[in-house]
Amino acid sequence: MKFTSVIALVATAATLVGAVPFETNAERLARGLPPLPPARRASGVEAAKPKPSPSHGCSTGPVQCCNDLVDRSNHTVGILIGLLGIVLGPVTGLFGLGCSPLLGGGAKCQSQTVCCSDNKFSGIINIGCSPINIGL
């Protein structure tokens, strides 16, 4: 009998606590009460930490997202090499045009993800690129 009464009392208390409406800080201030402290949703330190890029096996630098991936015979490559004064030796791989690095774990590439051996020209042209699939 006592056990049943205790269970009924706990159930009633839980129902009443759940039925109490949430009070906003504006309502508290209107009644002369101090505001409630802000709810902590995440640590500022955790949110500010950079997210690592996924493992991709690119040992020459960050994974790049390139608008175009072309071979040496492409006319645009010839023009860019001439304008930038690039002296090419033997090149293994393709050329990436209009590239930018993929940074962060949630980065997405709408074109072609590549690893390039020479990323010195601010993404205008990247040399020695190989397409990769990193599952983005």
From Swiss-Prot:
Similarity annotation = Belongs to the fungal hydrophobin family.
User: Where mainly found?
Assistant: secreted
Q: Which residues form the signal peptide?
A: 1-19
Q: List all annotated glycosylation positions.
A: 74
Cystines in this chain = 58-115, 65-109, 66-99, 116-129
Q: Enumerate the UniProt keywords alphabetically.
A: Cell wall, Disulfide bond, Glycoprotein, Secreted, Signal
- Subunit arrangement? Self-assembles to form functional amyloid fibrils called rodlets. Self-assembly into fibrillar rodlets occurs spontaneously at hydrophobic:hydrophilic interfaces and the rodlets further associate laterally to form amphipathic monolayers.
Under Pfam families, the record lists: Hydrophobin
User: Quick one: a GO cellular component term?
Assistant: extracellular region
Which GO MF terms are attached to this record? structural constituent of cell wall
The keyword Phosphoprotein is assigned to this record: no
Q: Which species expresses this protein natively?
A: Pleurotus ostreatus (strain PC15) (Oyster mushroom)
Location of the protein in the cell? Secreted; Secreted, Cell wall
Question: What name is this protein filed under?
Answer: Class I hydrophobin 16
Taxonomic lineage of the native organism: Eukaryota, Fungi, Dikarya, Basidiomycota, Agaricomycotina
What happens when the protein's gene is inactivated? Answer: Increases the sensitivity to sodium dodecyl sulfate (SDS, a cell membrane degrader), hydrogen peroxide (H(2)O(2), an oxidative stressor), calcofluor white (CFW, a chitin synthesis inhibitor) and micafungin (MF, a beta-glucan synthesis inhibitor). Leads to sparser aerial and reduces the cell wall thickness by 40%. Does not affect the chitin and glucan amounts, nor the cell wall synthesis-related gene expression levels. Also, does not affect the hydrophobicity of the aerial mycelia.
Cell wall biogenesis/degradation among keywords: no
Relate the protein's function as given in its record: Aerial growth, conidiation, and dispersal of filamentous fungi in the environment rely upon a capability of their secreting small amphipathic proteins called hydrophobins (HPBs) with low sequence identity. Class I can self-assemble into an outermost layer of rodlet bundles on aerial cell surfaces, conferring cellular hydrophobicity that supports fungal growth, development and dispersal; whereas Class II form highly ordered films at water-air interfaces through intermolecular interactions but contribute nothing to the rodlet structure.
Q: Which domain of life is it from?
A: Eukaryota
